[in-house]
């Protein structure tokens, strides 16, 4: 895209795009690639599959740009978030507004480039057609899941009962993360590899269960993670008022004082480190962290069980088992 950026004079967008795709875990492309191998074995020419899988990282970058803007996050992977990077280009009182506007456009451009990269990856027209519905569903699910996450943080979802809040958190967990991060990428690769229905079903179960465990690990890191490892300030989920499964478990398990204290801290501007320590102590004391750790372990075990008995390539199976560990046993 360098030539287009030069012709339009929008080289700052290309520079920011490079920064957005630097680092990261590359898990979604990995699940896509090994989903294909599970169905069809290693491709003779891996280039088209690798390009198609890599396009998922451009999609992910586009969503992270918008996610950081929605959350007001200053950093991503230890560097300034996209809107802060753009903001630094313009001195004066309108810098923040420019940064926000430019970040919206950068996210849109990355989304477009992701689609272009997939379509021009060199896959056969038949393969592109087979995969189109999986990719379209994946995009829609993550965007609607993101809306639910934002709505819950702002109090625009049903909070009338603990069950209603838990239902919203479960939907966010499934659609914003589990399907988007693991299930759909694995199904996309398997669909490209012409997987039979039985294998697609096994990968779907594996993907949803493992994706839940992946997000629960993120939720724990969002409260207890080391900023040096995560690249984001500790306690951001508390600052942003995220009512994750972890937080809702603490609210449900806590006594009246613990519940009211934690509830009052969620989404409150200007939280101090002492406030965040209080929130962490409540989450620990109520057993919420241990409960989520147990749920991660159980979901991961169930995900691996879903692969048993499924007819798939041995190397693909082994890689999917390895990826399960990488997705859940991590510090970033």
State the predicted function of each range.
Residues 31, 114, 145, 247, ...:
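Residue-level signal for inorganic ion chemistry
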Residues 38-40, 46, 189-198, 221-229, ...:
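C-terminal helix-coil-helix/basic helical segment that borders enzyme active sites and/or dimer interfaces
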Residues 16-17, 35, 53-56, 135-142, ...:
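Short alpha-helical scaffolding segments that buttress acidic/His motifs in well-ordered protein cores
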Residues 42-59, 100, 128-135, 199-210, ...:
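Alpha-helical scaffolds flanking conserved acidic
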Residues 277-332:
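Short hairpin/turn module used for nucleic-acid contact or packing/dimerization
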Residues 76-107, 157-178, 201, 205, ...:
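Divalent-cation-assisted or electrostatically stabilized phosphate/pyrophosphate-binding catalytic cores
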Residues 3-6, 20-28, 104-112, 119-224:
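All-alpha helical catalytic cores of prenyl diphosphate-utilizing isoprenoid enzymes
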Residues 1-56, 61, 65-66, 70-92, ...:
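Conserved N-terminal diphosphate/IPP-binding helix and adjacent helical/loop segment
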């Amino acid at each position: 895209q360098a030539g287009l950026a030069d012709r339009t004079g929008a080289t700052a967008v290309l520079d920011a795009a490079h920064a957005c795709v630097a680092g990261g875990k590359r898990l979604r492309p990995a699940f896509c690639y090994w989903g294909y191998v599970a169905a069809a074995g290693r491709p003779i020419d891996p280039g088209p599959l690798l390009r198609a899988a890599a396009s998922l990282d451009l999609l992910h970058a586009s969503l992270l740009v918008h996610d950081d803007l929605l959350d007001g996050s200053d950093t991503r992977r230890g560097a300034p978030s996209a809107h802060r990077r753009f903001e630094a280009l313009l001195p004066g009182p309108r810098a923040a507004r420019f940064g926000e506007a430019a970040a919206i456009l950068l996210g849109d451009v990355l989304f477009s480039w992701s689609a272009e990269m997939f379509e021009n990856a060199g896959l056969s027209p038949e393969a592109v057609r087979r995969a189109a519905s999986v990719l379209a569903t994946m995009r829609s699910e993550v965007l609607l899941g993101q809306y639910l996450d934002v709505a819950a943080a702002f109090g625009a979802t049903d909070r009338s009962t603990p069950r209603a809040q838990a239902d919203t958190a479960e939907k966010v967990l499934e659609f914003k993360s589990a399907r988007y991060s693991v299930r759909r990428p694995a199904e996309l690769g398997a669909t490209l590899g012409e997987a039979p229905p039985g294998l697609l079903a096994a990968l779907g179960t594996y993907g949803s269960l493992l994706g839940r465990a992946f997000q629960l690990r993120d939720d724990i890191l969002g409260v207890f993670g080391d900023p040096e490892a995560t690249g984001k300030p500790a306690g951001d989920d508390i600052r942003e008022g995220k009512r994750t499964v972890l937080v809702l478990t603490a609210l449900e398990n806590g006594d009246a004082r613990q519940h009211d204290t934690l509830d009052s801290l969620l989404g409150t501007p200007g939280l101090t480190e002492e406030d965040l320590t209080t929130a962490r102590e409540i989450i620990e004391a109520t057993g919420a962290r241990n409960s989520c750790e147990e749920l991660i372990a159980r979901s991961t075990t169930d995900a691996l069980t879903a692969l048993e008995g499924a007819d798939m390539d041995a190397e693909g199976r082994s890689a999917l088992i390895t990826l399960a560990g990488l997705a859940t046993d991590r510090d970033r």
